[in-house]
Structures are given as C-alpha cells and as structure tokens.
C-alpha cells in the first residue's frame, strides 16, 4: 500500500480527495484563531466577547457529528461531504460580512457545523479499503486532513496581508494591514468549489459493491435490550456537554440567567428527542418481536470504549493545543511568538503520528492491544509533562536545555496521543458496517465532549505551575483508566485483518463476481 500511495488512481484517488476535503473543512473551522486579533480590533471587542465567539465555534459540533453520521449512513459520503463543503461558504461569507457582535456569533454558530466533516471520510475510506489496511488508510485520512488546522494557523495571516489591497483591510495595532474579511470568505468559497469537484470525482463504493444502509438512520441500531439502555446512558454526555457550553456563555455574559434556563430545558428536550428516535429504531427489539442472530450482533460496549478513548486522545489534543502556547510562555518566560512556534510542534505530529498509529494497528496483529498500549503510553506521557515545572526547578531554571527537553517530551507525548487517534478509527469501521457513519459520529462527538470538559476544568484551575500540573495529571490519569478498559474489556473486532468487509462476499456474489472485491480493487480498479 505504501508504494501505491503516491498514485492518483482507484482507491488512492478516493483517499487523497477525501483527506483533502477534510483538510479544507478544518481550514474553514479553524479560520478564527489566526485572525482573532484583527477581528477584535476591528469591532472593538473585549476579551470576553472573543472567548464567546470561540465557544460558539465548537457549540454545535457535538450534535452535528451525530446528525452528520445519520445522514452519511442514509445518503452516502459522496453527497454528504459535497453538501457540507458547499454549505461552508454560507457561514464563512456571513461571518466576513458581519457588522456587529451578534452577527459574528450567529455566523460562528452556523460555522461550527463544518467541524463535523471528519466523520464523513471515515466511512468513505472504509468503503474503499479492506480491513487489513484500514488502519493506515484511516490514519492518513485523519492525520493529513487534521493538518488543516495548523495550515490555517500558519497561512491565514499571510493571506489576509496579501489581500490587504482590497477594500475592507484593517490595520492591526502594532501589526500589519490585514483584510481578514476576504481571507475568511475565501476559505469558504474554496471549500464550496472543492465540494462541487468532489461530487463529480468520487463514488461511494468501488464498482460492483452495494452501499450498505441501516434499516433506519434516526438513531443507532443495537442488537440487545441491555445495549439499548447502555446507549441511553452514553447519550447523556452529548447533551450534558452542551449544558456546560451554555453555562460558559452565561459566565461571559452572553446568556442571561433566563436564557440559560431556556437553553437547559431545550437541551433536555433534545436528549429526549434523541432517545425517542433510538426507541423508534429499536422498538421491535425492546418489545421482543425481533431477535438478532449471533452473526448479526455487536456489543455496544465496543462503541462506548472507543468513545472514551477518543475523549482521552482527541479531546486532550484539542485542549492541550489551546493551552500549550501559554504553558511554554509562562513556564520558561518565552516570547509569545517563540512559545507559539514550540506549541505548534504538537499539531505538526499529526502528519506522521496518526497514520503511524493506524499502521501499527495494521501490523501488530491485535487492534485491541495496539489501542491499549498507545493509550497507556499517552497517559504516562501526560504524567511526565505534569512534572516539567519540577524538572525545571531541579535543574535550576528554564535554560535552553530545559526548553529543548520540554519540547522533546511534548512531541513524544503528542505522538502517542495522535497515534491513539489513528488506532481508534482503525477499529471504528469494523464494529458494524451498516452503521459505521453513526458510530463514527458518536465517537467523534465524544472527542469534542472531552475537549470542552478538559478546557472547562482548565479554566477553573489556578494559574501557573500548580494549575498546569493538575491539568496534565488529570489527562494522564484519565488515559490510564481508559487503557485499563482497552486491555480488559475491549474485544478484538471480528475480521480485523480480513481480506474483505463484513457481508462483502455475499454482496459480490450477488453481482456475479467470482473473486473477492479487494482482489478486484488491487488488480482491476487500479
């Protein structure tokens, strides 16, 4: 596979076009932070208002990932991804044209939906690659696409500066002239144009394969009554974390106490609506009118553990990326620019670490053990990072050697975090194929749940070394607990290293093919 990766034919064309779709969705989703200073100065916003806009940037991502997962399973990744990328232009242009704080907030809320794009490519990639190669393929998709956030951070200021000759440029205090409006609008327009190209360039499945759809996309289909109640329990944090976001909006003064109460009632209603839809999907099972054969069953605890792994890896990544520049600046007395450059090393690891985690999962012969070992190493890495201030004090200060040592520790920990993400989504497509989109949506949503929970905790901790130490210790202990669950409760998925996906041979036989589809893929499609 590695030697064929450079080709742009067959399934590799699909992989490259899909990771780039994810890349663009993250460029759009993360286009606020690099230009926040210019936006703040242009509108005369205070720090609380900027934080409110930042909260709105993630507010709807959690429910959007769940809903996108449902749409994905019903309509297929080709149409779903194309429409999401085309949609991205609307809130981007609206944000760029905003004339007051309220319009900025509304546009950013609408734009937070774009952050759900990751889920779509998980199923698209799984449709084109056999189980034995799914880890590396999903890792490349996730790792290279995720780099869109770093690309946005490094390039948008330059783009805004280049576009400064257009009307609407605004001089940043003690900085260059930036046309942030054109820069943000451009990201959305480029995404929309690529969405059109994507629709006419890809297919949902290879030739001869039928796209498997769930019996209903209104909620996750489970195969035992006990799993239904487990599903209800695991849906609670998805609404609960939105309540935390509503509370944070009240704390910064955007919500009044009355508006906060209304939001809580609405979110309780959202949970009940979701529960009702899950009941509709599974009512025959609950009433005893339907039973699943042993071959058609799956254990929902598999999904639950993957949701927890994504909390401790992707959730912690988003949280750490947000606080790491301030951590380096405060711990070692560095300038903001240098601290930001050092912190960027954490995100850069995505290019190799996430595919690396998927490749390890493919090659070691046990996806379960790979997940457990990577999560264990991640937990140890965070605990070591919590001791950086103590090591600094023991060595007598924050000289160049200590900064380099801290950077090495950070990048090492980052590798295990992002490799763990790759390992997580090496398992997700193997749980139950016809509901892969919904499983990916829920697991992905839990990553955002973790990020909001960790950042909320961080905002409540004391400033300085004590708060940083508690924060990293919390990340480390949470990872160690989840590693235990991976070792002793997570089960190896059926057909983890098979030549074809669940039910594939029957589908192929029905269409008159005499050889397995992966062989057709490698020999004929390419």
Where are the regions a protein language model picked out?
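Conserved MFS/SLC helix-loop-helix module at the cytosolic interface between two early adjacent transmembrane helices
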Residues: 63-102, 368
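C-terminal transmembrane helical hairpin of 12-TM major facilitator-type secondary transporters
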Residues: 338, 367-423
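Cytoplasmic helix-loop-helix junction between adjacent transmembrane helices
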Residues: 107-144
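Extracytoplasmic gate region of multi-pass secondary transporters
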Residues: 32-36, 231-266, 299-344
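Central cavity-lining transmembrane alpha-helices of secondary-active solute carriers
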Residues: 52-70, 344-357
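Glycine-rich segments within core transmembrane alpha-helices of 12-TM secondary carriers
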Residues: 135-164, 441-455
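Helix-breaking motifs and short loop linkers at transmembrane-helix boundaries and internal kinks
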Residues: 44, 76, 97-102, 114, ...
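C-terminal membrane-cytosol helix-exit motif in multi-pass small-molecule transporters
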Residues: 188-211, 235-252, 265-285, 482-491
């Amino acid at each position: 596979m590695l030697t064929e990766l450079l080709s742009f034919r067959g399934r590799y064309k699909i992989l490259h076009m899909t990771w780039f779709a994810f890349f663009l969705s993250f460029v759009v989703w993360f286009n606020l932070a690099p230009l926040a200073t210019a936006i703040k100065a242009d509108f005369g916003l205070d720090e609380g208002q900027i934080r409110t806009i930042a909260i709105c940037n993630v507010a709807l991502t959690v429910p959007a990932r769940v809903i996108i997962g449902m749409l994905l399973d019903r309509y297929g990744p080709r149409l779903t991804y194309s429409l999401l990328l085309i949609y991205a232009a609307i809130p981007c242009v609206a944000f760029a044209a905003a004339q007051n704080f309220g319009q900025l907030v509304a546009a950013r809320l609408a734009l937070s939906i774009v952050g759900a794009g990751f889920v779509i490519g998980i199923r698209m990639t799984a449709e084109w690659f056999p189980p034995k190669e799914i880890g590396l393929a999903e890792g490349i998709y996730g790792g290279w696409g995720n780099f869109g956030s770093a690309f946005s951070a490094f390039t948008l200021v330059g783009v805004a500066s280049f576009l400064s000759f257009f009307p609407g440029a605004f001089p940043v205090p003690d900085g260059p002239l930036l046309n942030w409006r054109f820069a943000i609008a451009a990201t959305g327009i480029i995404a929309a144009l690529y969405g059109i190209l994507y629709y006419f360039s890809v297919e949902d499945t290879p030739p001869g394969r039928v796209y498997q759809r769930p019996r209903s996309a209104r909620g996750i289909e489970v195969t035992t009554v006990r799993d239904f109640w487990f599903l209800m329990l695991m849906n609670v944090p998805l609404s609960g974390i939105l309540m935390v976001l509503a509370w944070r909006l009240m704390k910064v003064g955007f919500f009044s106490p009355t508006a906060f109460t209304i939001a809580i009632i609405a979110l309780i209603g959202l949970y009940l609506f979701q529960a009702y839809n899950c009941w509709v999907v599974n009512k025959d099972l609950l009433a005893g009118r339907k039973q699943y054969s042993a071959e058609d069953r799956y254990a929902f605890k598999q999904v639950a553990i993957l949701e927890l792994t994504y909390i401790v890896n992707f959730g912690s990544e988003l949280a750490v990326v947000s606080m790491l520049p301030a951590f380096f600046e405060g711990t070692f007395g560095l300038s903001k620019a240098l601290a930001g450059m050092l912190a960027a090393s954490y995100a850069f690891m995505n290019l190799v670490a996430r595919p690396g985690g998927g490749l390890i999962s493919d090659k070691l012969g046990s996806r379960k053990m790979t997940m457990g070992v990577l999560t264990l190493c991640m937990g140890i890495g965070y605990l070591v990072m919590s001791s950086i201030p103590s090591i600094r004090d023991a060595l007598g200060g924050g000289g160049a050697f200590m900064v380099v040592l801290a950077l090495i520790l950070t990048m090492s920990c980052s590798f295990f975090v992002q490799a763990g993400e790759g390992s997580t989504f090496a398992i997700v497509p193997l749980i139950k194929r016809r509901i892969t989109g919904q499983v990916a949506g829920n697991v992905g949503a839990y990553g955002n749940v973790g990020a909001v929970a960790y950042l909320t905790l961080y905002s409540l901790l004391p400033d300085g070394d004590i708060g940083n130490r508690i924060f990293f210790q919390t990340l480390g202990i949470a990872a160690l607990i989840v590693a235990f669950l991976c070792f002793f409760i997570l089960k190896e998925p059926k057909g983890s290293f098979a030549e074809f996906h669940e039910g594939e041979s029957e589908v192929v036989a029905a269409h008159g093919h005499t050889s397995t589809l992966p062989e057709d893929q490698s020999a004929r499609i390419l």
